[in-house]
């Protein structure tokens, strides 16, 4: 998987280096397996050109921590501005949807890694955005299993569709809190 990709040319250059390495190993008499090529979507330029990048890759992984940081120009480790690190920012949610759709159109798998998938409500929202593969710390796996088992993807798709029409983090938080109060948003049954 190629990290911090920002352009199609970078992917092509990296794939050429990979091919050269495979040819060198084959020339030495070694058997080289087919290696799927993945792209980390971590910067806005990669997210915005996802439809082009999808033609060059076998899969995407969206690195939400970096994508949020670089899209919002906020250093999540700097206490002076880290409060502006907003996973629910409309731009972030729209980028996630855009990348998922681009991958789907090209028929490639897209997964999500980062802290978003480790938060129960955000995980439900990611499911509502059509994302189905997640990477997280081992400690978050039991929670994620429970959330996935209890979540109605259909209901969360409705919630996500509404969330994607809202213009501010505050409006999104308000809507989600109302949904939670109504019926534990996204739960089966």
Task: Report each predicted region and the residues it spans.
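Conserved alpha/beta-domain cores
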Residues: 1-189
